[in-house]
């Protein structure tokens, strides 16, 4: 679990040449809740030196950014149900699962995440590689048409 701290580090880039913080949509001044992250998550992000992100110590109401790392479909369901109730309108939930090539034991695929998220009123809007082990799927609350 990340503590509420100010983060300053050097930018790192992934496969696309785009820093992970940009792919995920981190912005300076935002608050974020991250759960189950790999030990090198902060260095993977590669936030700019002047970026300030507040890491929430626990899930709370009206969150604007959540990133869950999990290998378990049952945990995914429990956590998404909880986050869905707490995410702000326009907020983002990233779910990361191990790539098959990582050989990390998991019962989650990209389709599993959609199967759980869509009935909850969440829609997937983006996918990205987090690192050599983790992929990520960006979810948002489905907007109701007027």
Enumerate the language-model features and the residues they cover:
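N-terminal, charge-rich interaction modules
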Residues: 5, 9-48
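Short acidic low-complexity segments
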Residues: 52-63
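Short, glycine-rich nucleotide/cofactor-binding loops
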Residues: 66-76
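N-terminal and secondary-structure boundary signal
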Residues: 74, 83, 142-146
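Mid-chain, well-packed structural core segment of small domains
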Residues: 78-107
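Conserved Class I S-adenosyl-L-methionine
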Residues: 108-124
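Class I S-adenosyl-L-methionine
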Residues: 121-146
């Amino acid at each position: 679990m990340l503590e509420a701290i100010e983060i300053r580090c050097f930018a790192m880039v992934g496969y696309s040449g785009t820093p992970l913080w940009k792919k995920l949509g981190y912005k300076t001044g935002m608050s974020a809740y991250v759960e189950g992250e790999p030990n090198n998550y902060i260095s993977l992000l590669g936030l700019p030196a002047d970026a300030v992100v507040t890491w929430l110590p626990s899930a709370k109401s009206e969150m604007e950014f959540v990133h869950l790392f999990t290998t378990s479909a049952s945990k995914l369901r429990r956590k998404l149900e909880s986050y869905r109730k707490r995410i702000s309108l326009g907020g983002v939930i990233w779910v990361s699962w191990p790539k098959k090539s990582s050989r990390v034991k998991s019962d989650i695929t990209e389709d599993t995440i959609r199967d759980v998220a869509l009935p909850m009123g969440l829609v997937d809007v983006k996918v990205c590689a987090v690192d050599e082990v983790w992929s990520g799927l960006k979810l948002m609350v489905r907007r109701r048409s007027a």
